Structures are given as structure tokens and as C-alpha cells.
């Protein structure tokens, strides 16, 4: 869910070319790999399922669909070898669910290098968790960790190497660990995602995540129609005034937590 504003446009920017590693095999990872490659960056895609990744490696790219149409986007490297993918990367983008973060951190730790920036989108406080996990695994690399509260895209895979991007975020409030290096991290991330903006430390970034606010009421309060109908869109049919009222109440609690911890506006209410 793109809670921080959205656009149907493109992330096209043929400016500074950067080596970017994208980790994951889901909707967001394929969207990021295609979008960033089309923007002119040298993108390397990793997922642990080598057989599933073979569709991309065999074709040499990803089919990207968005408001501009459908086209093939070449991906410089797609590999199940994490060392190959992250070696030399300036930016490591992880658009994966929180449930995958421990496994990714364990695999990633031996390959991290000084001056790399790891960007979790979304993070759900995984930036700090992965940083401490990597350190516990013995990594001493001087890495900057950053996270925002949402995927940069509303995206859906339509096949083993095809992704449809219907929306792109226009604001990505991002927190950094360690916070004193926030400017350095955001300068790197901003070359890939111009929509990033500073929101303080990494906990502040985690508290921008609208997912825990939006999705539980939608699922719980739509349990009956979800079980009854073959198709039921929780975001349109399921977002009734009563559901929205609960969502708004939860979001006020999120903002109250931010304020209690000393974080100032903007809180980006839903």
C-alpha cells in the first residue's frame, strides 16, 4: 500500500549510473529490478530459488508493464549467487517481506563491504534488526542501513518474469541507521529513488509503515465476504465507512506513538 502519495508515471532518469543489487523474488523485487534498470542503472537481481530465476536469466530481462505500455527491460545479471550480485554494489535494495529478513541477513552478512547502503522498502524495523544480525554473524563492514514504510511500487507479477506496475510512490520518508550518517545514505538512495526524504532515525522510518494499520482491519472486518465470494476487493468493496473509521483510529495511535517517542511532523496520516 502506497500511503505516502503515488503516481502512475515512470522512474526514468538517465543520470548517474550506479551498481544496484536487488534482493528478492516477489512483486516488489521484480518491479525494482526492471524500473531501476530502465532508469539506466547497472542492476543485478538475486533470488534464492535458482529454478524460478532461470526464466529471467534465459530471457535476459523482465517484461515491464505500466502506464507507458509493455516492453522488455534487460537485466545485467540475475543470479542465485548472492556474492556475485552484491559484490561491488553501491546500493542494495531489499523489497522483501519481514519474514525473509533473517534469512537474507544471514546470507548477506559475509558479502557486505564498506560504503554500501542497504535500503529496505519496506523495512518494518528490519533495517536495525538486519544490521544487528549481520554484526552478530561477524560482519564488520561499515554499512549504512535505511528503510521506508512502503514498497516504492504498487506492483503485481503476471508471470515468471513479467511484472505490472500500476503506481509509483512520490514520497518515501526514510530513516537511517546510524542516524548521524543519514545524509550520506539518502544521497545514494536518492540517485535511485528521487522520492526519498529524510525522516530521522530508522525507528522513525519504521513508524511510517502503513501496512499494519491498513491491512488488519481490512482482513478481519471483511472475513465473511472473503470466505463467501469467489472475488472480493478489500480495497474498494471492502473499505466501508466502518472499516475506514477503524483504520483512522489505528493511524491516530501510530501517530501518538511517534509523538510519544519525540518524533515530529510530518507523520503522513492516511
Model features per residue range: what roles?
Residues 1-17, 97:
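N-terminal amphipathic/basic-hydrophobic helices that include classical n-h-c signal peptides
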Amino acid at each position: 500500500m502506497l500511503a505516502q502519495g503515488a503516481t502512475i508515471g515512470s522512474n526514468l532518469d538517465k543520470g548517474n549510473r550506479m551498481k544496484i543489487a536487488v534482493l528478492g523474488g516477489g512483486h516488489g523485487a521484480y518491479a525494482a529490478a526492471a524500473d531501476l534498470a530502465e532508469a539506466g542503472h547497472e542492476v543485478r537481481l538475486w533470488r534464492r530459488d535458482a529454478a524460478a530465476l532461470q526464466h529471467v536469466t534465459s530471457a535476459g530481462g523482465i517484461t515491464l508493464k505500466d502506464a507507458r505500455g509493455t516492453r522488455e527491460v534487460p537485466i545485467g545479471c540475475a543470479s542465485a549467487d548472492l556474492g556475485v550480485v552484491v559484490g561491488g554494489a553501491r546500493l542494495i535494495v531489499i523489497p522483501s517481506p519481514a519474514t525473509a529478513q533473517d534469512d537474507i541477513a544471514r546470507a548477506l552478512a559475509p558479502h557486505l563491504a564498506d560504503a554500501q547502503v542497504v535500503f529496505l522498502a519496506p523495512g518494518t524495523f528490519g533495517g536495525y534488526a538486519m544490521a544487528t544480525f549481520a554484526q552478530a554473524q561477524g560482519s564488520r563492514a561499515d554499512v549504512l542501513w535505511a528503510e521506508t514504510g512502503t514498497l516504492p511500487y504498487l506492483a503485481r507479477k503476471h508471470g515468471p518474469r513479467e511484472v505490472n506496475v500500476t503506481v509509483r510512490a512520490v514520497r518515501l520518508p526514510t530513516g537511517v541507521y546510524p542516524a548521524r550518517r543519514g545524509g550520506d545514505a539518502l544521497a545514494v538512495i536518492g540517485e535511485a529513488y528521487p522520492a526519498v526524504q529524510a525522516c530521522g532515525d530508522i525507528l522513525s522510518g519504521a513508524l511510517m509503515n502503513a501496512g499494519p494499520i491498513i491491512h488488519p482491519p481490512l482482513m478481519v472486518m471483511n472475513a465473511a465476504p472473503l470466505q463467501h465470494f469467489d472475488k472480493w476487493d478489500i480495497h474498494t468493496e471492502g473499505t466501508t465507512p466502518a472499516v475506514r473509521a477503524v483504520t483512522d483510529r489505528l493511524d491516530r495511535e501510530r501517530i501518538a506513538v511517534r509523538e510519544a517517542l519525540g518524533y515530529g511532523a510530518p507523520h503522513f496520516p492516511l
